[in-house]
């Protein structure tokens, strides 16, 4: 069965057909790294990591890029408050980000570009928009001419007239039209800045993603994803910038995950009700939070509370217990029983059911229901007077198959993603030191744990084998 996904651009489910057969170019908007991530940041990390896992499970070669915004107003404010420079703060919280999402079972992207490392590409992008007549300079600032782009508003499904009715030019802004948005901001005294054709300054938020997508993935990509709050203006503006420059469809499919509420109230820093991931995982198994997030369809809102997370723990434990019971019965059963084929068919039905749910817009909530049904049948099977090892093995392998996509583990023996990343870094260091014996040893160790490595020009990529 083919994958169908809900495309925000068309507001309907569509059959997934990548631009190039067998390959997927995927970009996910990453965090602004001025603080530890909260659970609202964790949701897209978990959701799109799972989407990537499933695309790979289906045989696609996925090129996955997710950025860091390592310079903007929030970072500058944090730097001033802490008496540190912007690069120091961003580096600290990038490291913390990897620790937090690694604990949640998220693999690193193939590339994690940062704004400060791609300033030349950003400036070049802005310069080309100016030369094509889609942008203009005003006293050191550069603005995008929103009305010059005919398709503006197509992602958020708003007309120019609707947008204009609520737009205002704030005091100090030097733009020609209230709908125009900043591509480049002139430097302010004491702020971090870069040289450009328009004087010292720094980029606007929206241009950063457009420039990095173009640099690392090209003019067109298959999937662009992020939180629902990014639909407008961020993703709308990305489309305008990129399509104005290239004349091509920027992204074929747009995926957006829903909001997170805290105790039935929208999470916001102004209300002081946001919850940091590193606080949660001090008290709970990090995999529990991932399981909790995936128990709701990615487009639906999630209501989070400590009570709900605690309630989820008992459900997660039931899966782990079923899996553990299978492991303990292995090698203590007979070789053949008379109804083996029926049970093997039952196990196979769960693979088909899992794929059917995931093919339908990555419905992890229903996919987890398939896991519980698998656990129920495993428990029934283990209650038999006589069991067969090859049937128990089939149950175990089906559990492993499903949870390898969902990204959590039911057994203690499986390596966490962060442990895999650490081993890969140790192997990379061995290769840099020309210690090929150690490098091969680590590769073989990972292979024995069903971890497949691929060395590319962009670095080492890995996936769990089927």
Swiss-Prot record:
It comes from the Bacteria. InterPro entries: Cys-tRNA-ligase (IPR015803), Cys-tRNA-synt_Ia_DALR (IPR015273), Cys-tRNA/MSH_ligase (IPR024909), Rossmann-like_a/b/a_fold (IPR014729), tRNA-synt_1_cat_dom (IPR032678), tRNAsynth_Ia_anticodon-bd (IPR009080). Pfam families: DALR_2, tRNA-synt_1e. Its EC number is 6.1.1.16. It is an enzyme of class 6 (ligase). One of its GO terms (molecular function) is cysteine-tRNA ligase activity. Monomer. This is Cysteine--tRNA ligase. It comes from Bacillus subtilis (strain 168). The gene is cysS.
């Amino acid at each position: 069965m083919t994958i169908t996904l809900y495309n925000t651009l068309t507001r309907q489910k569509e059959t997934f057909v990548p631009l190039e057969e067998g390959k997927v170019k995927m970009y996910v908007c990453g965090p602004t790294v001025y603080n530890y991530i909260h659970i609202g940041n964790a949701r897209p990390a978990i959701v799109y990591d799972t989407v990537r896992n499933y695309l790979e499970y289906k045989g696609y070669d996925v090129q996955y890029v997710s950025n860091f915004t390592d310079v903007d107003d929030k970072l500058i404010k944090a730097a001033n408050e802490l008496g540190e420079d912007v690069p120091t703060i961003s580096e600290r919280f990038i490291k913390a980000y990897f620790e937090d999402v690694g604990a949640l079972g998220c693999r690193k992207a193939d590339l994690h570009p940062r704004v400060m490392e791609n300033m030349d590409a950003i400036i070049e992008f802005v310069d080309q928009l100016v030369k094509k007549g889609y942008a203009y300079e005003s006293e050191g600032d550069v603005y995008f001419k929103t009305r010059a782009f005919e398709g503006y508003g197509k992602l958020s499904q708003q007309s120019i007239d609707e947008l204009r009715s609520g737009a205002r030019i704030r005091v100090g802004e030097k733009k020609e039209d209230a709908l125009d948005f900043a591509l480049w901001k002139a430097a302010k005294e004491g702020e971090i800045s870069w040289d450009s054709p328009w004087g010292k300054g720094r980029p606007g938020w929206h241009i950063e993603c457009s420039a990095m997508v173009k640099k690392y993935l090209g003019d067109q990509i298959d999937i662009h994803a992020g939180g629902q709050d990014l639909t407008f203006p961020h993703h709308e503006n990305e489309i305008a910038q990129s399509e104005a420059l290239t004349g091509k469809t920027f992204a074929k499919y747009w995926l957006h995950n829903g909001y997170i509420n805290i105790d039935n109230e929208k999470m916001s820093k102004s209300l002081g009700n946001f919850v940091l991931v590193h606080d949660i995982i001090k008290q709970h198994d990090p995999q529990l939070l991932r399981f909790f997030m995936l128990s709701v369809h990615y487009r639906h809102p999630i209501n989070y509370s400590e009570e709900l997370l605690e309630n989820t723990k008992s459900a997660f434990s039931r899966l782990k217990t079923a899996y553990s019971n299978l492991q303990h019965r292995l090698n203590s059963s007979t070789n053949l029983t008379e109804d083996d084929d029926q049970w093997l068919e039952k196990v196979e039905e769960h693979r088909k059911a899992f794929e059917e749910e995931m093919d339908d817009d990555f419905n992890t909530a229903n996919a987890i229901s398939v896991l519980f049904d698998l656990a129920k049948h495993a428990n029934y099977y283990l209650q038999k007077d006589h069991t067969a090892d090859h049937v128990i093995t089939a149950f175990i392998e089906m559990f492993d198959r499903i949870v390898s996509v969902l990204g959590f583990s039911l057994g203690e023996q499986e390596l966490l993603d962060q442990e895999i990343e650490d081993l890969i870094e140790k192997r990379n260091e061995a290769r840099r030191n020309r210690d090929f014996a150690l490098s091969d040893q680590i590769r073989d160790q990972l292979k024995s744990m069903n971890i497949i490595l691929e060395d590319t020009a962009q670095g080492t990529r890995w996936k769990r084998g089927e």
